[in-house]
C-alpha cells in the first residue's frame, strides 16, 4: 500500500502548506506582498488602464496577461506576464502596489521560489505527465479503499469509540478503525476534488506555441476599467478578482469573480464573464 500512501502523504502535506501561502508570504516578505497605504492614497487605487500603461512602460519586453486582485485590499495585485516572442510562453508574475503604482518585485516564473516549487510538487510530484497519472491513480485507489472500509465495517457506529488496550494486536485494530472512520470523509473529499482538478486539466485544449505574444495580441484601445464597470451591470452583484487577457489562440478577455450572497461552495473566481478581444462584445 506504500505506492498509495507516499504520493498521498506528499500531496496532503504540500497542500496543507499551500493553503496558508498568503499568510506565510505576509510573514516572510511583507514589504513585497503588502501595499503601502497612507492618508494620501488610502482610497485612491489607480485604474486598471493605468496599471496596464505602467507595466507596458516599465516592463516593455513583457505582455500583461492577467491581473489578480486580492480579496484583501491591503494586499498587492499579482500581475501575470509572458515575455514577448518567448517560444515556451512561460508565465511569470510580479507584485504590483495598485495604490502607489509601484512594481514591488522582479518577474518570477510561476514555478520558481519556495511556493512555486511546492505547487509543482503538489500538482505533479516533479514528474510532469507521469506525476499527473500517478496522482490520478492514487486518488482512484484511495477512493475505493475508503468505500471498502465502509462496506467491511457497515455498523461502524456500534464500536466507534471502543479502544481496547489489553493486547497490542487488538489495540492496533481498534485504533486503525477509529482513525479510518474519522479520516475517511476528509480523504474522500481530497480524492474527489483532486480527481476533478486532474480531469479539468486533462480536458483543457492543447496549448499551441505558434501563437505570438506581442503588443498586438488584443485591441489595446479597449478600456479595462470600462469592461469592469460593464461586468457589474451585466451580472448584478459581480465583483471581479481576476482579469484574464488573451494568452493563447482563440482566447478572449475574461473576468473571473464572485456574486454577492452566492452559495458558500463558490469561491471568488466562480463566476466568469467573457468579452471579445477586438470589440468587447
Language-model-derived ranges and their functions:
Residues 1-281:
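Conserved histidines in hydrophobic membrane contexts and catalytic metal-binding motifs
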Amino acid at each position: 500500500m506504500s505506492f498509495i500512501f507516499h504520493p498521498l502523504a506528499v500531496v496532503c502535506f504540500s497542500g496543507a502548506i499551500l493553503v496558508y501561502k498568503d499568510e506565510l508570504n505576509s510573514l516572510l516578505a511583507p514589504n513585497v506582498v503588502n501595499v503601502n497605504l497612507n492618508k494620501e492614497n488610502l482610497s485612491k487605487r489607480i485604474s486598471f488602464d493605468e496599471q496596464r500603461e505602467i507595466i507596458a512602460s516599465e516592463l516593455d519586453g513583457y505582455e500583461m496577461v492577467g491581473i489578480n486582485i486580492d480579496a484583501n485590499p491591503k494586499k498587492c495585485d499579482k500581475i501575470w506576464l509572458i515575455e514577448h516572442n518567448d517560444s515556451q510562453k512561460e508565465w511569470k508574475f510580479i507584485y504590483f502596489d495598485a495604490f502607489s503604482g509601484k512594481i514591488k518585485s522582479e518577474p518570477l516564473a510561476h514555478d520558481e521560489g519556495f511556493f512555486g516549487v511546492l505547487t509543482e510538487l503538489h500538482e505533479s510530484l516533479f514528474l510532469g505527465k507521469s506525476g499527473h497519472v500517478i496522482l490520478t491513480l492514487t486518488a482512484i485507489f484511495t477512493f475505493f479503499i475508503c468505500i471498502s472500509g465502509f462496506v467491511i465495517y457497515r455498523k461502524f457506529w456500534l464500536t466507534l469509540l471502543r479502544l481496547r488496550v489489553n493486547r497490542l494486536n487488538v489495540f492496533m485494530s481498534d485504533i486503525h478503525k477509529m482513525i479510518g472512520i474519522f479520516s475517511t470523509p476528509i480523504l474522500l473529499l481530497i480524492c474527489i476534488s483532486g480527481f476533478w482538478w486532474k480531469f479539468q486539466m486533462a480536458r483543457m485544449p492543447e496549448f499551441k506555441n505558434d501563437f505570438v505574444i506581442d503588443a498586438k495580441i488584443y485591441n489595446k484601445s479597449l478600456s479595462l476599467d470600462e469592461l469592469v464597470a460593464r461586468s457589474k451591470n451585466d451580472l448584478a452583484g459581480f465583483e471581479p478578482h481576476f482579469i484574464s487577457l488573451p494568452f493563447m489562440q482563440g482566447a478572449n478577455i475574461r473576468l473571473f469573480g464572485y456574486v454577492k450572497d452566492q452559495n458558500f461552495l463558490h469561491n471568488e473566481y466562480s463566476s466568469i464573464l467573457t468579452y471579445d478581444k477586438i470589440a468587447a462584445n
